[in-house]
C-alpha cells in the first residue's frame, strides 16, 4: 500500500486577530471556522504567513465560535503580528490506489477581512481511467444563484 499526503482542509487568507507568545504552543482558531472545513482540535496544521513568508507546523485549539479568532501562540506568535494574513491547511494520509479509484475532496474556506466566509470551495480529484482530474468548484450560497454566478463570471472565476 502506497500512501500519499493530500490537503483535506484549508483556511485561506485568514487574518491574525492576536498573537500570544507566552501561551503554550499551538494556534487558536474560531471553532466555527474549524467545523466549516473539518479541522479537529489538536489536529496538526501547516501555516504560511503571506506578509513575511514564514512557515510553521503546529496544532489547533478551538476558539470562541463566531469570534473570527485566529491567534498563533507560543513561538509561532513571534512569526507573525496582528493583521498578518495566513494560509492554514491540514493534510491527511490517503491510500494512493483508493484516491485513484474513489477520488478525494478538500474543503477551502476563503476569508474576508473579518475572517467571515467570502467564498467556499471544494477542490476535488475525480477518478478517470487510472488517473485523476482536478476541479475547483465554488459552493453557491443559498438564494444567491444568479447573483453569485454573475459575480463569478465578471471576475473571470468561471
From Swiss-Prot:
Keywords: Autocatalytic cleavage, Cytoplasm, Decarboxylase, Lyase, Pantothenate biosynthesis, Pyruvate, Schiff base, Zymogen. The keyword Transmembrane does not apply. CDD domains: Asp_decarbox. InterPro entries: Asp_de-COase-like_dom_sf, Asp_decarbox. The active site is at residues 26, 59. Disulfide bonds: none annotated. GO terms for cellular component: cytosol. GO terms for biological process: alanine biosynthetic process; pantothenate biosynthetic process. Its EC number is 4.1.1.11. SUPFAM superfamilies: ADC-like (SSF50692). It is found in: Cytoplasm. Substrate binds at residues 58, 74-76. It comes from the Bacteria. The modification Pyruvic acid (Ser) is found at residue 26. Is synthesized initially as an inactive proenzyme, which is activated by self-cleavage at a specific serine bond to produce a beta-subunit with a hydroxyl group at its C-terminus and an alpha-subunit with a pyruvoyl group at its N-terminus. Pathway: Cofactor biosynthesis; (R)-pantothenate biosynthesis; beta-alanine from L-aspartate: step 1/1. GO terms for molecular function: aspartate 1-decarboxylase activity. Its cofactor is pyruvate. Binds 1 pyruvoyl group covalently per subunit. Heterooctamer of four alpha and four beta subunits. HAMAP family: PanD. This is Aspartate 1-decarboxylase. It comes from Trichodesmium erythraeum (strain IMS101).
Amino acid at each position: 500500500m502506497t500512501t500519499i499526503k493530500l490537503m483535506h482542509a484549508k483556511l485561506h487568507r485568514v487574518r491574525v486577530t492576536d498573537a500570544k507568545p507566552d501561551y503554550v504552543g499551538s494556534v487558536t482558531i474560531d471553532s466555527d471556522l474549524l467545523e466549516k472545513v473539518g479541522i479537529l482540535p489538536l489536529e496538526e496544521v501547516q501555516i504560511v504567513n503571506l506578509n513575511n513568508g514564514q512557515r510553521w507546523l503546529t496544532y489547533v485549539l478551538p476558539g470562541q465560535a463566531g469570534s473570527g479568532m485566529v491567534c498563533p501562540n507560543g513561538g509561532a506568535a513571534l512569526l507573525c503580528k496582528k493583521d498578518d494574513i495566513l494560509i492554514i491547511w491540514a493534510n491527511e494520509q490517503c491510500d494512493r490506489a483508493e484516491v485513484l479509484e474513489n477520488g478525494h475532496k478538500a474543503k477551502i474556506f476563503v476569508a474576508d477581512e473579518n475572517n467571515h466566509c467570502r467564498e467556499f470551495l471544494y477542490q476535488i480529484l475525480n477518478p478517470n481511467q487510472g488517473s485523476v482530474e482536478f476541479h475547483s468548484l465554488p459552493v453557491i450560497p443559498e438564494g444567491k444563484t444568479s447573483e453569485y454566478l454573475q459575480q463569478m463570471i465578471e471576475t473571470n472565476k468561471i
